Amino acid sequence: FYIMAPYWGQANENGIQPYLAGQISQEQALENIVDPMREFMFRQTRESDLALFVNLSEAPRPEGPEDVSTFTLIPAFIISELKTAFQIGFMIYIPFIVIDMIVASTLMSMGMMMLPPVMISLPFKILLFVMVDGWHLLIQSLIMSFR
């Protein structure tokens, strides 16, 4: 909600409230609500993802953003966000897998083959996450992923 607040406010101000007051038609209200959302999605969608879905839709090549269908924009936006989520997830995964490898190799070198490495590495992973202020870094990277 933090990222979308200006867009939701604009949709409420230009679409919902005028419609509830009877000043505009339902079609105009829907257009006024969708416009800020489209603007947000265009700003966040990678050009390559948008091009992929434009090509898959077999629609004529759009001249500008207003020519791109909302039904084409939404999946492109979702794919862009999923790509960002996977990148963030991978960056979190790397230090954890390093801890797993260090703990597993240490246990093997000590001859403790029957002790599951997860029992030892999990507290180290939690400790690392807490010491580097993981929640702060995670939320910051999520917010910074929005340009």
Regions found by a protein language model. Name each.
Residues 1-147:
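Hydrophobic alpha-helical segments and their helix-loop boundaries in membrane
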